[in-house]
Amino acid sequence: MTFFSELPGPSGTTVRLLNEQLYSLTVNGRPIAAATLLPEQLEEFAAGYLITEGITAYSEIESIMPDTAVIGVLTVNPFKVLLPRKTVVSGCGGTASYLDPARLPKVPNGDCLSLSGLTPDFPAEILAAGGFTAAAYTQTGRVASASDISQHAAFDKVIGSLLRQG
């Protein structure tokens, strides 16, 4: 997949722009969120977003159908109204946060992995353009990585990728 479009710039130069697109995420036909994303790993983004926002369990997702501007998700019970269960401050929205860092569990030293030699190949052009990459490693050795124009979207794609891998 190409991450960039090349457009004519001033004085005969070429301008490279990330191919970001606005998507509406819907669940059972109801709008849940709008996100500007790179047009790849859209199913992974939808799964990761719905899980991290506490909207539904992965086992409740029946299907994910990305289109040109909408990522539609159907759940096992389409009549159940699903809404986010938490609000976390991000950017300049000015909302309340219910995430208390003091209550988060500590990671035991034995659960930490040495990342020496495990770093996946991140697209250098995404990083150079100010984009973000994310990677996750499981204790069973599964690896997932993703890139996007925001770190939240990259993490949601990684989480969704691991969920879809099983």
What is each model feature region?
Residues 1-134, 139, 144-152, 156, ...:
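Intrinsically disordered, low-complexity regions enriched in acidic/Ser/Thr/Pro/Gln residues
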Residues 166:
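Acidic, glycine-enriched active-site microenvironments
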